[in-house]
């Protein structure tokens, strides 16, 4: 007789009219019964030939290619001038007194952050901006390039000037070593050579400083020597390699001594200009990733300079005859002054050797599902998470649901702060720059790569006939529209650029770890400064709690001022006041406990409406369904064990078929959600123990025992004993000597037993008692005669071993010789 839904609920002891627990519960551990129920519910069917369902409501497989939508009107978000103060430790100590070891260690981690992968793969510049939107290639190129420029202007990126130097905007840190020229710092005045050199001798004067000291110049053009900034095989007269905005200075010859002075800077800057107009082949040479310029003899260059100036690709159109109605020369002739070919930051620093390559691609997407007007930059540094260049990221503990409830479930009044661009607060050491490079190859090479026109790939980038190969109707129309948005910046953005991260990027596994360490240390400082209040953070989500609303407002003012004094930028418009029910990490947390937020509850209802019955569903779609249901599982009667059939199918990579009964069972489970309550401290008065053949309980002074019909595995027997203890005594603190029961993970038990036990033991706290001290040990072995005294076992609710919440005691007067601690860095979070 097939199993009905009512019979199934009765079987799981979810209804009140069940028989005595000692008889009913052990039956659920029977393997035969579990198999029969699974067959009735269609849970273990072999693979069938019916085609799989690949979409359930909004859920598609994890690897489905949902095409992103390009928005030509995306606004690039503005970034404030974020500069986290370097003496952050001193400022915190002024605020709260001496820091604890933990706080100091965490703050030192991010001042500056360091990133040293074992090996790095370099990609050509053409892969800098991903062709993510094939229909809007040019538009996406300029939008992305503008976003990168905005980040550079906000001091979040370095711009690679030469192989060994970079420039940036904003305030410098002490570890960013400014380039020195003689005794004089490389300041704003000396950078003018890049944009427009002053009349008179070049910065490389009569004497050049080499590593050996001051040496006279070795003639007009020192050919054979190699500069440390990379090997360039055939060098040309600097006056002939004139790029727009770089006027040749009087004596400006390139003298290549082995120095890191301005000659290298000037020559490399001009070389970088040249590399967008000359035919360049990029090779990985033994001396570094250098650019090789081919077939440019001084004589050929000189003859060119007399005719058409060797200028940038963009400005060459000015002197050319229009090839058609949509020739780019029409656009270029709209403006007389297109501005400089490149821009340079206020500060120039020394960096490790950095090739003109990228290590990750970038593209734009909507800022979030609710804000499609603004764009967000996605940086793909996935090479550091895959294959041979994989980096083992540090793991850090995240509070599980019970810890979070123990900590935050209270009658406090709450508000949450929004840290604007939180990741971009944390500075990176310049030594990390060669590993975190983004950029673009310039418009001409980008369009050429995506164009099917093979003529563009020949080696004649400098000639006029080749120039007009780019003139297509689509490109012309796109650029004319973009001209309205970007104006003369079109010229700047059409040049190649290489940028390295100065603040931690979002696409690297190190960043979430560092952000969590940083915000947890700051919150720890705030908690110690205001011991009667609560400050807590998860990543960039910071919450403050206080006894009354007035108290909370004054706390908010004090904390905001403190954070601003450290250089942390808050977004006051996004500060949310929650009253007594805090919305945090997808939960609503109040004095009554924790529940999922309403939008998640609605998502679950929508999901159940869409789940088809008796049709195989692709296991990747099941992953999505389980992800959603798993989040709310702790709030249901049967918890995670109810989802075990789905987990099993995903593990076997097989399709899953929902039977009407299993679907009805699950939807009923999720129709009523029970809050997860805060654990309370107390004394343990109830103990349970079991052997494979029998169980024993001690409830206060009362002792009882029983036997199983057939021998059971020890973990199953211990779980049954704990269930009996809970149902007989009603106590919510139970002592047990079994670590599996203690962990409260019932997914490895027989399925029906796991579901029933989860409901019986919901809200129970367990205390570990060693077997030798367990008073229930004798009754479980059938000995009721000997009465062992009850051990005094206090239960203390835990807030978890998390790097996000450390109780901060007053600083000890002296440090112990050796501190033993299990580092929270190696503890991965698993669902509670």
Curated annotation (Swiss-Prot):
Residues 205-220, 251-263 have a biased composition (Polar residues). Residues 178-335 are annotated as: Spacer. Keywords: DNA replication, DNA-binding, DNA-directed DNA polymerase, Endonuclease, Host-virus interaction, Hydrolase, Inhibition of host innate immune response by virus, Inhibition of host RLR pathway by virus, Magnesium, Metal-binding, Multifunctional enzyme, Nuclease, Nucleotidyltransferase, RNA-directed DNA polymerase, Transferase, Viral immunoevasion. InterPro entries: DNA/RNA_pol_sf, DNApol_viral_C, DNApol_viral_N, HBV_DPOL, Rev_trsase/Diguanyl_cyclase, RT_dom, Viral_Replic_Matur_Polypro. Residues 346-589 form the Reverse transcriptase domain. Residues 205-263 are annotated as: Disordered. The record marks 63 as: Priming of reverse-transcription by covalently linking the first nucleotide of the (-)DNA. GO terms for molecular function: DNA binding; DNA-directed DNA polymerase activity; metal ion binding; RNA-directed DNA polymerase activity; RNA-DNA hybrid ribonuclease activity. Residues 1-177 are annotated as: Terminal protein domain (TP). Residues 336-679 are annotated as: Polymerase/reverse transcriptase domain (RT). Mg(2+) binds at residues 418, 540-541. GO terms for biological process: DNA replication; symbiont-mediated suppression of host innate immune response. It catalyses: DNA(n) + a 2'-deoxyribonucleoside 5'-triphosphate = DNA(n+1) + diphosphate; Endonucleolytic cleavage to 5'-phosphomonoester. Its EC number is 2.7.7.7, 2.7.7.49, 3.1.26.4. The keyword Cell membrane does not apply. The keyword Repeat does not apply. It holds the Pfam family DNA_pol_viral_C. Activated by host HSP70 and HSP40 in vitro to be able to bind the epsilon loop of the pgRNA. Because deletion of the RNase H region renders the protein partly chaperone-independent, the chaperones may be needed indirectly to relieve occlusion of the RNA-binding site by this domain. Inhibited by several reverse-transcriptase inhibitors: Lamivudine, Adefovir and Entecavir. Belongs to the hepadnaviridae P protein family. HAMAP family: HBV_DPOL (MF_04073). Hepadnaviral virions contain probably just one P protein molecule per particle. Terminal protein domain (TP) is hepadnavirus-specific. Spacer domain is highly variable and separates the TP and RT domains. Polymerase/reverse-transcriptase domain (RT) and ribonuclease H domain (RH) are similar to retrovirus reverse transcriptase/RNase H. The polymerase/reverse transcriptase (RT) and ribonuclease H (RH) domains are structured in five subdomains: finger, palm, thumb, connection and RNase H. Within the palm subdomain, the 'primer grip' region is thought to be involved in the positioning of the primer terminus for accommodating the incoming nucleotide. The RH domain stabilizes the association of RT with primer-template. Multifunctional enzyme that converts the viral RNA genome into dsDNA in viral cytoplasmic capsids. This enzyme displays a DNA polymerase activity that can copy either DNA or RNA templates, and a ribonuclease H (RNase H) activity that cleaves the RNA strand of RNA-DNA heteroduplexes in a partially processive 3'- to 5'-endonucleasic mode. Neo-synthesized pregenomic RNA (pgRNA) are encapsidated together with the P protein, and reverse-transcribed inside the nucleocapsid. This is Protein P. The lineage of its organism: Viruses, Riboviria, Pararnavirae, Artverviricota, Revtraviricetes. The gene is P.
């Amino acid at each position: 007789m097939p199993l009905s839904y009512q019979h199934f609920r009765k079987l799981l002891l979810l209804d009140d009219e069940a028989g005595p627990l000692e008889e009913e519960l052990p039956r659920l551990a029977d393997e035969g019964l579990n198999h029969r129920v699974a067959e009735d519910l269609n849970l273990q069917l072999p693979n069938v030939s019916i085609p799989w369902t690949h979409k359930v409501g909004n859920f598609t497989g994890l690897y489905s290619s949902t095409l992103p939508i390009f928005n030509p009107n995306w606004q690039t978000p503005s970034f404030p001038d974020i500069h986290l103060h370097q003496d952050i430790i001193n400022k915190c100590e002024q605020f709260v007194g001496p820091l604890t070891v933990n706080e100091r260690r965490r703050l030192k981690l991010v001042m500056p952050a360091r990133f040293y992968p074992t090996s790095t793969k370099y990609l050509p510049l053409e892969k800098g901006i991903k062709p993510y939107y094939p229909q809007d290639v040019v538009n996406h190129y300029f939008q992305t390039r503008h976003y990168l420029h905005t980040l550079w202007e906000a001091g979040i990126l370095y711009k690679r000037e030469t192989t060994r130097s970079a420039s940036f905007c904003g305030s410098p840190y002490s570890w960013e070593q400014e380039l020195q020229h003689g005794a004089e710092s490389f300041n704003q005045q000396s950078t003018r050579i890049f944009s427009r050199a002053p009349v008179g001798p070049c910065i490389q004067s009569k004497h050049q400083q080499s590593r050996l000291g001051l040496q006279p110049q070795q003639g007009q053009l020192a050919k054979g020597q190699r500069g440390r900034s990379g090997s360039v095989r055939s060098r040309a007269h600097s006056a002939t390699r004139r790029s727009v905005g770089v006027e040749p200075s009087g004596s400006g010859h390139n003298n290549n001594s082995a120095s890191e002075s301005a000659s290298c800077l000037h020559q490399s800057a001009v070389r970088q200009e040249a590399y967008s107009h000359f035919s360049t082949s990029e090779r990985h040479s033994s001396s570094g990733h250098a650019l090789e310029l081919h077939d440019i003899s001084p004589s050929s260059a000189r003859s060119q300079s007399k005719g058409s100036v060797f200028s940038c690709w963009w400005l060459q159109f000015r002197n050319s005859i229009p090839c058609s109605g949509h020739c780019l020369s029409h656009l270029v002739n709209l403006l007389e002054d297109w501005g400089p070919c490149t821009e340079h930051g206020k500060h120039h620093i020394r960096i490790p050797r950095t090739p003109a390559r990228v290590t990750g691609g970038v593209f734009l997407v909507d800022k979030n599902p609710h804000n499609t007007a603004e764009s967000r930059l996605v940086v793909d540094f996935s090479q550091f998470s895959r294959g041979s260049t994989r980096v083992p990221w540090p793991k850090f503990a995240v509070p599980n649901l019970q810890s979070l409830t123990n900590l935050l479930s209270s009658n406090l009044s709450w508000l949450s702060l929004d840290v604007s661009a939180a990741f971009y607060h944390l500075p990176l050491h310049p030594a990390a720059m060669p590993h975190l490079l983004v950029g673009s190859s310039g418009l001409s090479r980008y369009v050429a790569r995506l164009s099917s026109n093979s003529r563009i790939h020949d080696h004649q980038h400098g000639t006029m006939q080749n120039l007009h190969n780019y003139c297509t109707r689509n490109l012309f129309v796109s650029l004319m529209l973009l001209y309205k948005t970007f104006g003369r910046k079109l010229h700047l953005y059409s040049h190649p650029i290489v940028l390295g991260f100065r603040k931690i990027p979002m696409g690297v596994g190190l960043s979430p770890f560092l952000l969590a360490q940083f915000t947890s240390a700051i919150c720890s400082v705030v908690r110690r400064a205001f011991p009667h209040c609560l400050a807590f953070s998860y990543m960039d989500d910071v919450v403050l709690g206080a006894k009354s609303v007035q108290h909370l407002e004054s706390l908010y003012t004090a904390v905001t001022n403190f954070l601003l004094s450290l250089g942390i930028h808050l977004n006051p418009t996004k500060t949310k006041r929650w009253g007594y029910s805090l919305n945090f990490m997808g939960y609503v947390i109040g004095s009554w406990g924790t529940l999922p937020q309403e939008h998640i509850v609605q998502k679950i209802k929508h999901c159940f409406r869409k789940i088809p019955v008796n049709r195989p569903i692709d296991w990747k779609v099941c992953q999505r369904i389980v992800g959603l249901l798993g989040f709310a599982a702790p709030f249901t009667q049967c918890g995670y064990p109810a989802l075990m059939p789905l987990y099993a199918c995903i593990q076997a990579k097989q399709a899953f078929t929902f039977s009407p009964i299993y679907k009805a069972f699950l939807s009923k489970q999720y129709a009523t959600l029970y809050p997860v309550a805060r654990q309370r401290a107390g004394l343990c008065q109830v103990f349970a123990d079991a052997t494979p053949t029998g169980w024993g309980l001690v409830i206060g002074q009362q002792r009882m025992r029983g036997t199983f019909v057939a021998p059971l595995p020890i973990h199953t027997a211990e779980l049954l004993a704990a269930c009996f203890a809970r149902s007989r005594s009603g106590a919510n603190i139970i002592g047990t000597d079994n670590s599996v029961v203690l962990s409260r993970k019932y997914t490895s038990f027989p399925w029906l037993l796991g579901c029933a036990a989860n409901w019986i033991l919901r809200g129970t706290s367990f205390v570990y008692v060693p077997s030798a001290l367990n008073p229930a040990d004798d009754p479980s072995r059938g000995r009721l005669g000997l009465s062992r005294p009850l051990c005094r076992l206090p239960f203390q609710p835990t807030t978890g071993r998390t790097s996000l919440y450390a109780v901060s005691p007053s600083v000890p007067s002296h440090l112990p010789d050796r501190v033993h601690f299990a580092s929270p860095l190696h503890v991965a979070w698993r669902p509670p």
